[in-house]
C-alpha cells in the first residue's frame, strides 16, 4: 500500500513539476535599476524572475536578439518544456494577478497548439481564432513578456541577424502564436537600447488592444454566421424528411 501511494505521489509530482514555468529576465550589467524595477513589478505574483545577463552589442537590436536566443539555448540545455522570458522594462497590467493563472493553465492545456505566447503583442496580424482565454493569430511583435515552448527552441537558435532582422520579426515569421485579450503586460517608459533614446510605447499597446478587439469580434461573428448556416441546413433537411414521410 505504501509503495502504491509513493508511486502515485511520484507521478503527481512529475506532472506538477512539468507545469512549473521557469522565468528569466534579460538585463544588461550596467542597468541594475531596471532589474530592481522589474522584480518589484512582479512581487505578489507567482512569477519569480531570475536575472539573465543581457548581451551587449554596438547595434542594440542584435544584442537583444542574441540575449533571447541565449535563453532558448539555456532552456534547451535544461530540457525545459517551456520558459517565460521578460525584458527589464516589462510591467504587468493592473489585473495581471487575477488573470495570469487562468491563462497559464490554458497555455499548458493547449500546449500542442502553439509555439510562443505573447503577453503584450504589437502590430498584430489576423485572422484570429479563439481558443478559450487564448487567441491564435498569424503574427505579432514585442518580446517583453512571452512564453516559449520546447517546440520552438531549435528554430530560435537558427536566428541570424544579418539574414532575419530583429528577433521579434523572426519569431513572428517562424512560430505558431497565441495571445490573450486584454493583454497581460506592457513596457514602461524607459531608455531603449534598440532606439537609443527614451521611448513610450503606450500608444502601440492601446492600438493593439483595439486591433485585438476587432479581430475577436470578426472571429466570433464569423463563427456565429457559420453556426446559423449549419442550423439552417439541418432545419431544411428535417423539413425535407418530414415532407417525404
Region locations from a protein language model:
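An acidic/histidine-cluster motif and surrounding catalytic segment
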Residues: 2-86, 90-245
